[in-house]
């Protein structure tokens, strides 16, 4: 196993944060905790329901960790939407993370997908059944164009996860494969479209800006995620089908060359994102900027990405990139480092146990006769 290229990662991260002029001022600490708890509480009750517990069959600790990660992502990044929208998006994106971490073969449950869809029957695949049930709660926040993007992108995501089940990084020489798979499973259009709820934006009035934002966000969001998650995925056996690793296989280049390719594309996308919307509707630009800064804060602060390990490793180094990275990390931590104990309560498993006990008590009640009911 190669050693992690720490110096290169520091330089790349610093350039990215400088390009987007990182300065997360989306919330006060009190507002952040309030929104985190609201979104978490609604989502936790959703996943504690018996139907969700029975059909998802996810380890309770993994489900808890997934929910906390996604609530953080949504609250930090979708800073302009309502708390209710944050909660519904948190549920939707938690479903996607659960699927992303799954190793089940979807083939048997997808044999009748279109027939069931056309006939209005419940899907055989439990994930689709649950996601479809929740979709109306998500789509009620958006106009028809944004809604179509959310639906289509979610379908693409499912297909991308299906492909990943084969741990296939592409054939050498298949240069289009890495980006094809990353666009498929990146949820870029879903994310890009879900920034524009109808209570804040008229999608007909802002159609051109929204369409462009969806197009730009598709690459920016997934590439930033690939860069910021490169450290955690570097030596994780479950994460070897990443964009960078697929570049290595398909383009037949070294790991350093693949990382440089991703870096250059991410930095170019960041420049475009800032430049394209600089003179557009101020509300649109503000929404995009808040998303970008919040999305970076989430990556720097969420334990899933382990970037605190990089910080601890380099905080005493005297190089310019190390000092800049540490300054950005501390800046993010000052606004975004909120312990889950302050907002992620009660645990999903606790809520599920309470529901199970209540159901047992309900089942033990004596059945009253019709005469007793009248009396």
From Swiss-Prot:
Its EC number is 4.2.3.6. One of its GO terms (molecular function) is trichodiene synthase activity. Pfam families: TRI5. It is an enzyme of class 4 (lyase). Pathway: Sesquiterpene biosynthesis; trichothecene biosynthesis. GO terms for biological process: sesquiterpenoid biosynthetic process. It comes from the Eukaryota. Keywords: Lyase. It catalyses: (2E,6E)-farnesyl diphosphate = trichodiene + diphosphate. Belongs to the trichodiene synthase family. Trichothecenes are sesquiterpenoid toxins that act by inhibiting protein biosynthesis. TS is a member of the terpene cyclase group of enzymes. It catalyzes the isomerization and cyclization of farnesyl pyro-phosphate to form trichodiene, the first cyclic intermediate in the biosynthetic pathway for trichothecenes. It serves to branch trichothecene biosynthesis from the isoprenoid pathway. This is Trichodiene synthase. It comes from Fusarium mesoamericanum. The lineage of its organism: Eukaryota, Fungi, Dikarya, Ascomycota, Pezizomycotina.
